[in-house]
């Protein structure tokens, strides 16, 4: 039995591939999170580009804390079952009048995951049409569409060949609300044309019974059990941006390099990711 979502919401997610406007976090929680992030940006400007990127949940205890908020995990469990792995956290910050945007894509295009994982967009600031909120194509979660590869943030990313944008839905969210979408849902966003930062944390949650089409994934067990051992288990961060956390993230990405964000490796290819060198 679902703990939070209604039968109507569950049905909508299954058929349309997304839910929006779920009230989860308080303004106080969001402001505290934002303050911690901006303090890090101030003290470690040279590390921001990689530390707030792939698997930042391994680096910062306050990212892990927000990502494992009980109400949020109740909602995720309603969608993917009782055994839940947090497989990635990544910041999505758009500066005022900036050019950052994301073309139409499906996160599981290069490495498919079955059963599907879900992606949670946590709106730390308001997310509006003007500041480049997330946009989704309803019903596009039913199959992987043809795609091409392009370079973004020093890695290869998939972009859908053709999209009917007339059906797109803007996922407008207030501060503290979350939007959730299936890993196969086509989504993207435009640039920020407002005077304020658009600030979000985006998390991937996978059912522990899921398997990747390529390689072996890894994640932090945040609900239930990982009894089938289909995923490598990641540690909880101890403190914020410690040397131990940085080394731990490096070990995970070297041991389990084939994840949905980094994509599959070619034969003989070595893992490549941004990191701090000691």
Which ranges hold each PLM region?
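Conserved hydrophobic/aromatic beta-strand scaffold that supports enzyme active sites
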Residues: 2, 18-20, 24, 119-123, ...
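Short, solvent-exposed loop/turn segments at secondary-structure junctions
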Residues: 26-27, 92-94, 109, 127-129, ...
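Non-heme Fe(II)/2-oxoglutarate
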Residues: 43, 185, 190-278
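Short, conserved beta-strand element in jelly-roll/cupin
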Residues: 105, 112-129, 172, 204-207
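Short, surface-exposed loop/helix-turn segments at secondary-structure junctions
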Residues: 106, 153-165, 197, 215-222
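Double-stranded beta-helix
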Residues: 129-190, 210
């Amino acid at each position: 039995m679902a703990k939070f979502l209604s039968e109507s919401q569950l049905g909508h997610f299954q058929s349309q591939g997304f839910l929006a406007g779920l009230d989860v976090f308080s303004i106080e929680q969001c402001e505290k999170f934002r303050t911690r992030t901006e303090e890090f940006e101030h003290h470690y400007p040279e590390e921001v580009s990689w530390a707030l990127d792939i698997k930042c949940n391994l680096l910062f205890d306050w990212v892990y804390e927000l990502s494992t908020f009980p109400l949020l995990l109740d909602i995720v469990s309603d969608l993917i079952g009782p055994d839940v792995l947090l497989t990635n956290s990544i910041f999505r910050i758009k500066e005022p009048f900036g050019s950052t945007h994301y073309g139409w894509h499906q996160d599981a295009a290069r490495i498919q995951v079955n059963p599907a994982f879900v992606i949670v967009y946590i709106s730390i600031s308001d997310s509006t049409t003007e500041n480049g909120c997330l946009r989704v194509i309803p019903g596009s979660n039913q199959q992987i569409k043809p795609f091409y590869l392009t370079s973004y943030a020093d890695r290869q990313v998939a972009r859908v060949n053709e999209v009917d944008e007339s059906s797109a839905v803007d996922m407008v969210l207030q501060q503290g609300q979350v939007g959730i979408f299936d890993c196969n849902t086509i989504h993207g966003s435009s640039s920020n044309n407002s005077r304020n930062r658009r600030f979000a944390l985006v998390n991937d949650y996978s059912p522990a019974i899921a398997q990747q089409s390529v390689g072996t994934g890894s994640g932090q067990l945040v609900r239930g059990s990982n009894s089938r051992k289909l995923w490598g288990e990641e540690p909880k961060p101890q403190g914020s941006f410690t040397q131990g956390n940085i080394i731990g993230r490096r070990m995970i990405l070297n041991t389990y390099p084939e994840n949905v964000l980094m994509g599959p490796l070619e034969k003989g290819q070595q893992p490549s990711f941004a990191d701090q060198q000691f």
